Amino acid sequence: MAHFHRILVPVDFSKHADAALDLAIELAKESGAELHLLHAYELPSSVTMAYGVAIPQSVWDGVQEAATAKLEEALARAKAAGVAGTTHLLTAPAADAIAETAAAHKVDLIVMGTRGLTGLRHVLLGSVAERTIRIAPCPVLTLKAKPEAS
């Protein structure tokens, strides 16, 4: 098995991201790697451009607080498994934030789900995963969540 020092896990709080986090925790335990958990968000420009709406700072603050709390919950899962880690919260397009964070922190591996909370369906991969694979400075391991029992 490869020896990893730093593993980046982009999290959007979907079931696919949860599955990726579980796998990343196992890989980190086996290799002694540190986890970097990243959540990136942005307001779609179509909302502000089409309606000329300025989003109140209190709304942005609420988004940041909720995301920070969810990131800390994810980090607590890693720490409970004996894995060290840190969190990153960025306001940027997700794939760009993933690639930039991976480069800045000299990440050895990105582990991410193939679909998130975008609501868009792509034939094989979600758009963020697909773009990340193309621009990432390191290997990207993608996985899909287990199908839900019917």
Model-derived features with residue positions:
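Small/aliphatic-rich secondary-structure junction motif
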Residues: 2-53
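Short, hinge-like loop/turn segments at secondary-structure boundaries
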Residues: 52-56, 104-106, 128-129
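Glycine-rich, Arg-bearing micro-motifs that act as flexible, cationic patches
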Residues: 109-131, 149-150
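General small-molecule cofactor/ligand-binding pocket signal
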Residues: 36-38, 86-90, 141
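Short, conserved catalytic or interaction motifs in soluble domains
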Residues: 13, 122, 145
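Structural beta-alpha unit
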Residues: 1-2, 76-110, 147-150
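Acidic, proline/glycine-rich short linear motifs
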Residues: 40-69, 149-150
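Short, flexible loop segments at boundaries between secondary-structure elements
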Residues: 140-146
